[in-house]
Amino acid sequence: MLAWYRAHRTPELTRVAEALAVIGGVQVLPLITLAIVAGLYRAGARAHALFLALAVGGATLLNVVTKLIFQRPRPDVLEAVLREPGFSFPSGHAMANAAFGIAITLIFWRSRAGWPVAVLGAVWAVLVGVSRNYLGVHYPSDVLAGALSSLVWVVGLYLLMGQFRPSLRGSPAGERDNR
């Protein structure tokens, strides 16, 4: 699959993939997450703010620990557009962005923005994951493992927190379920 991506690289697609890597990476995604956490907190949706922070932060911590356990080398550097430090499995970009997309979907699901947020979150996570393969810095299994790990982590966290913070299951804006 990585050979297919390499054979279909174009300068335009490479620029898009590199931009996704930056936005979904350690410099920008945490700032986006913190901005949304702050907005939720200011809006009085403290359980939602805590959930988003724990979802993305916990996925990041889980990723670091998992990489240290498996220590899988990255794909051949000759295949890659970028050079990334550290181990390959699971993809940190895929894991953090999937956690972000799933968490904001769960937060806004009962609001009017539910479907658009769900679609945007899913599309975003898929685009970031595909970009990691396109750039040659991860195997497809790294991306899949990162996304699935985040799915299990974030949904499990949501169910657990919902037991102790029932307000988490409502809309952050206090809207009624319009479905």
Stretches found by the model and what they are:
Residues 31-33, 40-115:
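Membrane-interface loops
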Residues 3, 51-56, 124, 146-147:
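Alpha-helical transmembrane segments of multi-pass membrane proteins, especially transporters
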Residues 79-179:
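Membrane-embedded catalytic cores of phosphoryl/pyrophosphoryl-handling enzymes
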Residues 3, 22, 39-40, 106:
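Surface-exposed charged/polar residues within alpha-helices that form helix-capping/stabilizing sites
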Residues 37-38, 130:
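Generic hydrophobic alpha-helical segments
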Residues 25, 29-36, 56, 117, ...:
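Hydrophobic alpha-helical transmembrane segments of polytopic
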Residues 1-28, 68-81:
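N-terminal transmembrane-helix/juxtamembrane module of multi-pass inner/ER membrane proteins
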Residues 4, 64-65, 159:
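Membrane-interface helix caps of multi-pass small-molecule transporters
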